[in-house]
């Protein structure tokens, strides 16, 4: 029996596997129903709130004809003191085909993989990693740059905002750097991690040299204290506005949820250069490909 194929971080995949997943995802764009996962059962267990990721995974599974069981954490035995380890062991005893988990603690999926015999797919763990978000972002970039990952080499992407608290940033930094993009981190000092990457405190200073803007939400739920004067003060420096984009050939990404007029201006969200909804569409296709990869290969 082969060991389960987990996806806990982007580094679990080599470049060839990533390219295979993206190619497979693109084949799903015009196909809304396949039977690749018929008679498979997938459990989703989210200890943090989610709109896009949870819905995207469940739609992806159902489009592949899998049965989906959503564990309602608020009604589960974890509220009675059952440990994560025991929860995982009990779920595993039901022989699911995969478990998709989101948790506030970094490394939760890594810990659970030793308790189960099926694939664990990380849907976000604390500020650590969000591999499927990075994969869907990579697909969005691939499609924009003439559907060729080689065209990403040398392109500059500014990741803007609450980087130190962002699992999306961590996963994208690892993945996009691997495919040759130059990553620039743009944020106030207290939002920047210790890094070897180029950093900048001013969005306007680097706006004219980048090809891609990736804005991030300010994750106030991960802040121990107020660390900026106000969201209005923050937006005055880091909100993506029509003035910042100007008439340049750039695109805008955001993992959602978007804080309108704080992360991205209303007018920019309506601009065709803003690819936020394309990211959401790509998310379903990428997660279909990830589920098939982890369960069937």
UniProtKB/Swiss-Prot annotation:
Catalytic activity: carbamoyl phosphate + L-aspartate = N-carbamoyl-L-aspartate + phosphate + H(+)
Entry GO MF terms: amino acid binding; aspartate carbamoyltransferase activity
Entry protein name: Aspartate carbamoyltransferase catalytic subunit
Disulfides per UniProt: none
PROSITE patterns with a match to the protein in the record: CARBAMOYLTRANSFERASE
EC number per UniProt: 2.1.3.2
Any matching Pfam family: OTCace_N
Pathway field: Pyrimidine metabolism; UMP biosynthesis via de novo pathway; (S)-dihydroorotate from bicarbonate: step 2/3
Job of this protein: Catalyzes the condensation of carbamoyl phosphate and aspartate to form carbamoyl aspartate and inorganic phosphate, the committed step in the de novo pyrimidine nucleotide biosynthesis pathway.
This protein's record includes keyword Transferase: yes
HAMAP family, per database record: Asp_carb_tr
Binding site for carbamoyl phosphate: 52-53, 102, 130, 133, 256-257
GO terms, biological process: 'de novo' pyrimidine nucleobase biosynthetic process; 'de novo' UMP biosynthetic process; amino acid metabolic process
């Amino acid at each position: 029996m082969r060991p389960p194929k987990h996806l806990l971080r982007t580094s679990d995949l080599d470049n060839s596997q990533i390219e295979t997943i993206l190619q497979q995802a693109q084949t799903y764009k015009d196909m809304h129903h396949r039977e690749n996962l018929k008679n498979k059962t997938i459990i989703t267990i989210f200890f943090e709130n989610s709109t896009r990721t949870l819905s995207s995974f469940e739609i992806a599974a159902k489009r592949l004809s899998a049965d989906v069981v959503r564990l309602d954490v608020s009604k589960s035995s974890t509220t009675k003191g059952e440990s994560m380890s025991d929860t995982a062991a009990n779920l595993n005893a039901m022989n699911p085909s995969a478990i998709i988990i989101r948790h506030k603690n970094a490394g939760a999926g890594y810990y659970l993989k030793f308790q189960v015999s099926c694939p664990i797919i990380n849907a976000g763990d604390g500020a650590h990693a969000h591999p499927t978000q990075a994969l869907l972002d990579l697909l969005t970039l691939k499609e924009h740059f003439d559907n060729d990952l080689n065209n990403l080499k040398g392109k500059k992407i500014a990741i803007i905002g609450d980087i130190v608290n962002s699992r999306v940033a961590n996963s994208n930094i690892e993945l996009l750097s691997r495919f040759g993009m130059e990553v620039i981190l743009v944020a106030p000092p207290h939002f920047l991690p210790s890094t070897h990457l180029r950093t900048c405190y001013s969005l306007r200073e680097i706006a004219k040299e980048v090809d891609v803007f990736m804005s991030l939400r300010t994750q106030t739920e991960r802040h121990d204290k107020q660390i900026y004067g106000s969201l209005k003060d923050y937006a005055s420096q880091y909100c993506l506005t029509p003035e910042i984009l100007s008439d340049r050939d750039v695109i805008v990404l955001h993992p959602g949820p978007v804080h309108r007029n704080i992360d991205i201006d209303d007018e920019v969200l309506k601009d065709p250069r803003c690819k936020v909804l394309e990211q959401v569409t790509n998310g379903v296709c990428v997660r279909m490909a990830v589920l098939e990869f982890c369960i069937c290969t």
